[in-house]
Amino acid sequence: MKTKLAILSVAALFLTACGGGSTESAPEATNDVPVVIQNPADPANAGFYIDGIVYTLVNGALEQPIEDSETNNVFKLLEFKSSGDINADGTDDTAVVLINDAGGSGTFYYLGILTSGPAPIIENTTFLGDRIDIKGISFVDGKFEVVYLDRDSETSFDAPPTIEITGIAELDESKTSFNFSCRDNVGICL
């Protein structure tokens, strides 16, 4: 009898310590693939994959402290936005322009694309340039195009950008990533 009581006591302690009375299930295992929130209708609260890191905006911005610095790493969505069905699934996708200012002299511009559908494209941004001047963004012939002014490699960043460039984003044949290209009139885009 004492043995049964001892075993039941140990079992009760074990179940209590291990949460045996809980009805919650264990969290599902995850892999190392980054999760990018892809809601084309709400780019102000979406994730953008830049340089191997997913930055998720909240109300169009994200501000993070920089280690060993008094400045912040700031991401901000600009007013430039276009919609179109780049992945041909019957639902519009969205392209936006966002900037990254890490407190130095540069302001880095990116084209970000948010796709609809069950399989979002993780690498959804491309670098456009540093201290450029965005003119507009549109959806043309199944591709997103962003028009901006930039400088050639010989021109100082102190001078305003004057060379018009059209950045082009299109979905690859497998519909798993974007191909980015550009065109201009002076040979910057090769």
Question: At which residue positions do the language-model features occur?
Answer:
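Sec-dependent signal peptide recognition
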Residues: 2-9
